[in-house]
Amino acid sequence: MLRCSWPGAVLCLVAFVPVLVAQESKAPAAGASFAVSFPRERSATPLDGRVLLLVSTDSTKEPRFQIADGPETQLVFGIDVDGLAPGKPAIVSTAAFGYPLKSLRDIQPGRYWVQGLLNRYETYHRADGHVVKLPPDMGEGQHWERKPGNLYSTPRWIRIDPRLRVPPFPLKLDQVIPPIPPPAETKYVNHVRIQSELLSRFWGRPVYLGAHILLPEGFDDHPHARYPLVLSHGHFPESIEGWRETPPDPNLAPDSSARFRLKGYNRIQEQYAYRLFKDWTGPGFPRVLVVEIQHPTPYYDDSYAVNSANNGPYGDAIMKELVPYIEQKYRGIGQGWARFTYGGSTGGWEAMAAQVFYPDDFNGAWVACPDPIDFRAYTVVNIYQDTNAYRLASRWKRTPRPGQRDWLGQVTATLEELNHKELAIASRGRSGEQWDIWQAVFSPAGDDGYPKPIWNKLTGKIDRSVADYWREHYDLSYILQRDWKTLGPRVRGKLHIYVGEADNYYLNDAVYFAEDVLKGLKDPPADAEVDYGARAEHCWNGDHTQPNAISRLRYHQMFIPRIMDQIRKNHPPDVDTLSWRY
């Protein structure tokens, strides 16, 4: 669920302090409207997309990198543009929806660090007959603030006073975000990219799937060995995550992790990344293929690895096109008993979904801190019974539902705030953020071709017909119970679920419901493992021996030995369990 901020987004502007001070002292005045345009040099043709006005009080980094869920966030206001011509301004006024302030008229008069940005859309002619305008992924993992090709303005100090009656203040989008270079290959890390016929047919244009493959030690020296495959699910990986082939940098300046309350966490990450390399290449570590896939959609950095009315057949594309290609190219065993999956958060949901929707293709799923696996607890909302997602039902009170909490239970964002942030960034579920992708994955397509909302994004009113669709198609707990007669013999003993009881996004609530369902399954029993971390936050993964900050860096060392145990317990007779054991 949680997407970490891009490290490069934290820009050091110390060298520009004199310029910033001068700009601040001479800040021009603006009212409550801005005229945002781009020059012909950036595009000679009209553009579609979302114009964002970003307003901040902090000039140490660009405003586009300062929009967040928590109290530290700055301001964003957005409007859609269709066919915006070069040189023609788009007017961002008090009518533009904003977050966390809903309108520019609500800004207190003062000096602000201001920037404009255009998140560009392209037109898709889908196989279902719908024509939609969406932001394509450009190799960045669906992040509008750093998407190659997006246009933006140089930040500047501006005095904003909504009381002023002056012409819209001009902002020129004369900067463009550059392409992202491809990752390097090494002896152990390879990269593949294939065109998916299934997805290309759905989207009406070429669509590609990518993957990073971590090759086992001795791969070249054992040409006849065939290996088990581990699908490590998670958000869009730039390369194999948590992997480093050189010793930690002794000169690395220590950072400070607010999330884990640790100084020098960047040094810890390097240490454990190098430790993985040493373990992986050392004697005795199981020899397997680890695969991390890139499957961004126009709605998010990740498709959730299932077939979907709005994203297309990503589940089948991964399982019928990408995985067989990798197994053929890298000598995978290519049978369900020798495939496994694990992941945390989004990856946790995907791991469980892969085992449920493709029960014969995997021999075990290790599911850490999963996104909601039972929609009776869609974080803190029961979409089948509640009428409003943002507030508790009450005749007299308007108690907001929490959306995020810290390690002490302090609420840092409400559900309404989280959804209004997305609504400011984009209309029609195109923000590329968390709640919009859940909706894109789980919902049917609406009459306009965009995901049918589970609730009114502005008010929180739940659409029960959409909730019913979600239950039948993607409520993993419900589907297990409904289809246990056929699923039971194929997933018995294969589900391992872990979550912290202080999960920052309340994901433990859905696990409680799912555990009750799993315990009640009979003929055969589920034999599922469900474990909880006391006082553990997002994303606890079942390690009772290490703090969360450390255990999240050790997924492969934790789960691959457990995979070996599963192979010993559950494999067909007369299969190759020896060639890869060296």
Predicted regions and their residues:
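N-terminal secretory signal peptides that target proteins for export/translocation
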Residues: M1-C4
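Contiguous beta-strand segments within globular domains
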Residues: P28-F38, A44-L52, P206-H212, L231
